[in-house]
UniProtKB/Swiss-Prot annotation:
Record note on disruption phenotype: Strongly reduced number of arbuscules undergoing accelerated degeneration during root colonization by arbuscular mycorrhiza (AM) fungi (e.g. Rhizophagus irregularis).
Chain spans, region VHIID: 217-286
Organism: Lotus japonicus
Primary location: nucleus
Gene: RAD1
Region (PFYRE): 340-431
Leucine repeat I (LRI): region residues: 132-198
Induction details: Induced in root epidermal cells and outer cortical cells upon root colonization by arbuscular mycorrhiza (AM) fungi (e.g. Rhizophagus irregularis), especially in arbuscule-containing cells under low phosphate (Pi) conditions.
GO biological process: arbuscular mycorrhizal association; cellular response to phosphate starvation; detection of phosphate ion; regulation of DNA-templated transcription; response to symbiotic fungus
UniProt xrefs under Pfam families: GRAS
Protein name: GRAS family protein RAD1
Region (Leucine repeat II (LRII)): 299-331
Amino acid sequence: MSPPLYSVLLEDENSVFLLDLDLSSPMGFHAYPHLPILDSSIANWSLPFSISDETFRESKKLKRTMIPISSADFSISSSSSLSVSVNSIPRLNFRDHIRTYKRYLAAEELPEDTNSSESVVGAEEDGCADGMRLVQLLIACAEAVACRDKAHASMLLSELKSNALVFGSSFQRVASCFVQGLAERLTLIQPIGSGAGVSQSMMNIMDAASEEMEEAYRLVYETCPHIQFGHFVANSTILEAFEGESFVHVVDLGMSLGLPHGHQWRGLIHSLANRASGHGRVRRLRITAIGLCIARLQAIGDELSDYANNLGINLEFSVVQKNLENLQPEDIKVNDDEALVVNSILQLHCVVKESRGALNSVLQMIHGLSPKVLVMVEQDSSHNGPFFLGRFMESLHYYSAIFDSLDAMLPKYDTKRAKMEQFYFAEEIKNIVSCEGPLRMERHERVDQWRRRMSRAGFQAAPIKMVAQAKQWLLKNKICDGYTVVEEKGCLVLGWKSKPIVAASCWKC
C-alpha cells in the first residue's frame, strides 16, 4: 500500500502548484519532511522556501512534483539528486535566535537562590525544546494556511495561542504577532481566482492608524534607533547637498509617517541656523509635505514655522494632499533658484506592487523634478516575494531580531514594550502575513533590489561615506549594545547583531 501524501500548496496571487509530501512517518508533522528533524548537530536551517523567485518560476514552468525523501537519505552537502544546489539556498539562522531564547527561558525558570549547574543546563534544554517546538508549530501552521486546510490550521492555531505568550520570551512575543496574522489570513481565505477585496486609499498603514497605533509609533521612535538613525543620515546628506545654497527646498514623502513635532526637520532647521552668517546662511527653507492626513501635517508645519522663526530661519511650509501613486510633477512647486532634495523615510516600499508600473511611475516623477539628491531609508529585508511561505519565513527571521532587541532594552512586563510590539510591529507583521494584492502595503525589499529599481528609473547611486560618524552617533545617543552600522556598497545599514534592520541610501539624477 502506498504511503499517504500531503499536498503542500505553493502560491502566488494568481496561481498555485503542489508538492506531495509523505505523512506516513514521524517526519510528517515536521514542517519540512525532506529535511532532517532539527537536532543540536545542525548549525543552520536551510529552508527551501527561501529559494529565489527565479527558482520558483522555473519550478512552475517544469510543474515539478517533489518526491518524498527520508531524513536518512538526505544529505545537506549533496546536490546530485536536486536540480537546484542546496548550497545556493539562503540560510536563515534561526538557531542563533533559539540560543538567545534558550538563555531567556533558562533565566526565568531558575530559582533566585540556586547555584546548581545542573539546574542551568536543564532549564536551558527545556527552553530550547519549547522554542524549537514553537518554531515548528508556526511553520506547520503557515503551510496549512497556505494549503487552505482550515481544519488543520485551526487546530495548530489553537495550540499556538496557548504557547505564544504576549508577555513571554522574545520569541513567544513575536510568535503571538504571527499567530494573529495567520488567523486573519485563514479567515480571509477565498477560492483561488476570486477577488482580493477593495483597497483603501492609503500611503501606509499609519494613514488609518488608531490612537493606540499612533502612541506605539511614537514609542518606537523614542525607544528604537531605526527611525532616528534614518533621520540622522538623511539630514547629514541633505546638509551636504545644501552647502553654499541660499534657497533650499525639501520634499518629504509621507512626512515621516506623521510623527508629531516634525523631529527630523527640527534637527535640520537647528543645523541650518548654526551655519555661519553671510553666503553660507540659508535665506529661505521650503518644506513640502506629501500625505493624506492634512490636518496632522498642517499642525506639524505650524510648529516648525514657530520653531524656525525663533531661530531666524525663514520657513515656508506647504502640504500636498495626495498619495504617492497619484502625485504629479505639477503638484510640487519648484523654483529655478532653489536647491531641491527629496526625502523618503520608510515610504517607497508602500508603492511597490505586483507589477513594476506604480513604483516606476513615482520614481520617474521624482526624477523629473531634478533633485540634487533623493535620500531613502527603508527596511532592509525581503518581504515582497510572490510566495506566501517565503515571505512568512523572511519576516519571521526579521521581526525575531527586532523583538530580540526590545528584550535587551526593556523589561518583560514593560507596558511601553507591549504597546510597541502589539500595536505597531504586529500591524506590520499582520499586513505582510494576512494581506494580498493592493491591501498588502508592507512590501519591504533588500538594498540590492532597490538598487536595480532605482537604476531602471534613471537614478545613480551617491555613496554615503559617513560610517564613522554613524558609529559615533550610536555611542553619543547611548544606543543599546548589539546595534551595528556597516557600509554596504555605498549604503549605511543599521543592524541588530549583524541582522540588517534598515538601510539608508542616496541617489542622484
